[in-house]
A protein has these predicted regions:
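A contiguous active-site-proximal alpha/beta segment in oxidoreductase catalytic domains
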Residues: 108-165
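Hydrophobic residues in well-ordered beta-strands that form the structural core
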Residues: 66, 103, 128-130, 249
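Beta-loop-alpha module in the N-terminal Rossmann-like domain of NAD(P)-dependent dehydrogenases
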Residues: 27, 60-118
C-alpha cells in the first residue's frame, strides 16, 4: 500500500452504505460488527426504497438517510453497493465532495468512466477502492506466498443463475474476480486474449471462457458460468522455479493441496513420517526415481469481505492507497470488456 494524502482526518472513520440488496446487507452487517469492536463508526444506510433502508437501520441501530446528500454529509467514507449502472454517478458525486469510496465490482459500465473516476479520486486525494473481494481471501494470500513463478493457471467460478446482477453478463459478474486475481498474481503484461461465451437464460453471456497469454510466458485459462447446478470457486496453478509444484485451492472452503516433487535429499523415512503426521497427505506417484507428494496447505480461514472492509477503513484512516485501487481494478475491467467484445462479435 502506498501513502496518499486525504482531505479529512478523523480518528474514528464514519462509514455509510448505499444500497441494501443482497450484498449491501452484508456490508452493513460487517460495518456494524466493526463498530461494535470500536474499529469504525457506522453512520447509516441509504436505499431508494426507504422502507428497506429503515429496516436495516433499525436492525443495526443506525440512521436511515432520507437522501444521498444526507448520507454524504454524515460520512467520511461510503460503500457503494448498488446496480452497476449507478456506480459512476454515485462515485463521482461522493469523490467530488471529498468522500472516500469503496465501489463494488464491476467498477463502472465502461472504461472511460473508470478512467475518470481514477482521475477524480487523485485530484480530490480520496481513497478509491473496488470490491474485488477474492484478493482478501486467505487463499489468495497463501497463493502469492508459495507460487512465485506461475506458468499455467486454471480457474473455475460457477454458480446457479442469480436473482441479482442480471444487468451484466457472467464475465463482468463473475469472471472479473479471476481476471483481477490473475493480473495481480502474474505481474506481467497480457499479450493476447481469446474469449468465447454464450447466453443461456439472459440476453448476455451466461457461460464464458477466456485464455490469456502473458509476456513472461504464463498462460491462464478462465471459466465462468452462472447456470451451473453447483457452486465452485477454484484456482489451480502450475508453478516453476526452485520448487516445481501444482497447487489446487478452493476459495469457498479455504483449503487445498500442493503437489510437488520430493527433494532428492528428502529421505524416504522422514518423508513418510511427515506424511503420516499430515492429514490427507500421500505419495501420489513415483516415476524415474522421483516422487510426487500431495500435502494439505496451511490456510488460516477468515471472512474475505470483512478483511476487505477492514482494509478500506485502514486505508482511509492511515491515508493509504488500497491493494485494489481504481487503477488496479481498471486493468481487470479493460480485460473483461475485451472478452465481452469478442463474445458479442461471434
Amino acid at each position: 500500500m502506498e501513502t496518499v494524502h486525504a482531505t479529512r482526518n478523523t480518528q474514528q472513520v464514519k462509514v455509510s452504505v448505499l444500497g441494501t440488496g443482497s450484498l449491501g446487507k452484508e456490508h452493513a452487517r460487517i460495518y456494524a460488527e466493526l463498530a461494535a469492536a470500536g474499529q469504525v463508526e457506522f453512520a447509516g444506510v441509504y436505499d431508494t426504497v426507504a422502507e428497506t433502508a429503515q429496516k436495516f437501520a433499525q436492525k443495526h441501530g443506525v440512521r436511515a438517510f432520507a437522501s444521498l446528500a444526507e448520507a454524504s454529509a454524515a460520512s467520511d467514507a461510503v460503500s457503494i453497493v448498488t446496480p452497476t449502472t449507478t456506480h459512476f454517478e454515485l462515485a463521482t458525486m461522493l469523490l467530488q465532495q471529498g468522500r472516500h469510496v469503496l465501489v463494488e465490482k464491476p467498477m463502472t459500465e465502461n472504461a472511460a468512466q473508470a478512467t475518470e473516476l481514477c482521475q477524480i479520486a487523485q485530484q480530490k486525494a480520496c481513497v478509491l477502492q473496488v470490491g474485488h473481494v477474492e484478493r482478501f481471501n486467505p487463499v489468495f494470500k497463501y497463493l502469492e506466498s508459495v507460487a512465485t513463478d506461475p506458468r499455467f493457471i486454471e480457474t473455475h467460478r460457477l454458480s446457479p443463475f442469480p436473482a441479482r446482477s442480471t444487468d451484466i453478463g457472467v464475465v463482468l459478474d463473475l469472471m472479473i474476480h479471476d481476471l483481477d486475481v490473475v493480473l495481480a498474481f502474474v505481474k506481467s503484461p497480457v499479450t493476447s486474449v481469446d474469449g468465447v461465451g454464450i447466453p443461456v437464460l439472459s440476453k448476455s453471456e451466461d457461460i464464458a471462457n477466456a485464455r490469456l497469454r502473458f509476456a513472461n510466458g504464463c498462460v491462464a485459462n478462465l471459466t465462468a458460468s452462472r447456470v451451473s447446478p453447483e457452486r465452485m470457486r477454484k484456482i489451480r496453478v502450475f508453478s516453476g522455479g526452485p520448487m516445481t509444484s501444482y497447487i489446487s485451492l478452493d476459495y469457498r472452503a479455504q483449503e487445498g493441496f500442493i503437489y510437488r516433487i520430493a527433494r532428492d535429499d528428502e529421505e524416504e523415512s522422514s518423508l513418510l513420517k511427515k506424511l503420516l503426521r499430515a492429514k490427507d497427505s500421500t505419495i501420489v506417484s513415483a516415476f524415474g526415481g522421483k516422487r510426487i507428494v500431495r500435502e494439505p496447505v496451511p490456510i488460516a480461514k477468515d471472512e474475505p469481505l470483512k478483511l476487505e472492509l477492514q482494509h478500506f477503513v485502514q486505508c482511509v484512516r492511515a491515508h493509504l492507497t488500497p491493494d485494489v485501487s481504481g487503477e488496479s481494478a481498471k486493468r481487470a475491467l479493460d480485460l473483461a470488456f475485451e472478452i465481452t467484445r469478442q463474445i458479442r462479435a461471434q
